[in-house]
Amino acid sequence: MVDIIKTNATFKAGKGNKGTLSFEIPAKQISSGIDQAFNKQKDKINIPGFRKGHVSKELFLARFGEEALYEDALNAILPDIYDQAVNEADITVVGQPQIIPDDLKHGGPWKIHAEVTLAPTVELGDYKGVEVEKESDEVSDKELNAELERLQKGEAELVPAKEDQVSEKGDTVVIDFDGSVDGKQFDGGKAQNFSLSLGSGQFIPGFEDQLVGHKAGDDVDVKVTFPKNYQAKNLAGKEAVFAVTIHELKKLETPALDNEFAKDVDDSVSSLEELKAKTKEKLAKDKAEKNKDAFEDAAIQKVVDGAKINPEKLPEEMINDDVSRQMQTFFNNLAGQGVKPEMYFQITGTSQEQLKQQMTEGAPNRVKTNLVLEEIARVEKINPSNEEIDKEIKSLASEYNIKESEVEKSVSAGMLSHDLKVQQAVELIVNSAQAVEKK
């Protein structure tokens, strides 16, 4: 039989969505907490004549006093008591409370005050049958031709340019270059037979542009200014001249769009018409999937935009919690791919602070979306069954190739139930949404 704890909880509203939750911890729970605190501390206490961990509770209390156990006792029992007090006061809170013990005395009850932040309230707008624009899944001739052109470029080869041809963006030149600043050479400013794709942005701004319009064999003086934030501080912001010799000019030659090309691209077809049909079918499938995702996102966003949140400014605690979860999920995904955060930041040239800023920008909408979906689940009385939770555990175990017991250890039943509630609220919105043709 479950032992119901009575906390005599009361809530006093403060400014905005802040307030004070006052409650009591009964003697029975205090006694349990003191026992837990003693068991935690006894292994660390040195008392002459006793081995560590073998001192009696009576001797401990006589020597140090019961008050020495109060802090650990409170930490041990507070989480469950606090949850009960929140339920008793019939409030919904977010973030971590600021706990202020008021009267911790022998035998109790202990009086506690908790400065808390109330969750925003949600006033739903329409969420069933919302009208949302949807793109056509049909593939146009323009889209098909663009994809065939992409396939052509994928099969293109670099070939030597003709004598009368000049360089253009997209061409490749093989060059020698020798750079100088104020007439003096500098480290890293010289190379031979360097292959450069014009327009690739490999060199500092202005360098590649000045090699456009030339032929193989030309000598060109390229005049540029190093960016002020250039990594080599001794060159940053300075003017430079590069003596460049163009040894070779190569142009991309794309294959003809014919039956032979079709067979080279896909050995399962024997003609260009077959390739076109297969390509169009794939494009249609991809487009339908993309349009479906966009339709679902737009339907959810329309419902979220139509809801009113009070207060409109979301609690900072909710934003911070969301960002922390997003960061943790991101790092977990990296770990699953065998990538350490330091390696990721090095490869991408970003930092953890930049990633956090990126996550923070989307946090308000994510939090509002979650609040709205939770309210829909409440109004619609969506409560996942034990069978649905078990099915989700099996699904996660299969997806991540781990045992079901490992899923249960890492994700609580409450979290799974919440995720399923939100998921089913999403399905309710999407399944009832009305698609209208995009104008």
Swiss-Prot record:
Keywords: Cell cycle, Cell division, Chaperone, Cytoplasm, Isomerase, Rotamase. Its main location: cytoplasm. One of its GO terms (biological process) is protein transport. InterPro entries: PPIase_dom_sf (IPR046357), PPIase_FKBP_dom (IPR001179), Trig_fac (IPR005215), Trigger_fac_C (IPR008880), Trigger_fac_C_sf (IPR037041), Trigger_fac_ribosome-bd_bac (IPR008881), Trigger_fac_ribosome-bd_sf (IPR036611), Trigger_fact/SurA_dom_sf (IPR027304). It comes from the Bacteria. It is an enzyme of class 5 (isomerase). It catalyses: [protein]-peptidylproline (omega=180) = [protein]-peptidylproline (omega=0). Residues 170-255 form the PPIase FKBP-type domain. Signal peptide: none annotated. Its EC number is 5.2.1.8. It is found in: Cytoplasm. GO terms for molecular function: peptidyl-prolyl cis-trans isomerase activity; protein folding chaperone; ribosome binding. One of its GO terms (cellular component) is cytoplasm. Involved in protein export. Acts as a chaperone by maintaining the newly synthesized protein in an open conformation. Functions as a peptidyl-prolyl cis-trans isomerase. Consists of 3 domains; the N-terminus binds the ribosome, the middle domain has PPIase activity, while the C-terminus has intrinsic chaperone activity on its own. Belongs to the FKBP-type PPIase family. Tig subfamily. This is Trigger factor. It comes from Oenococcus oeni (strain ATCC BAA-331 / PSU-1).
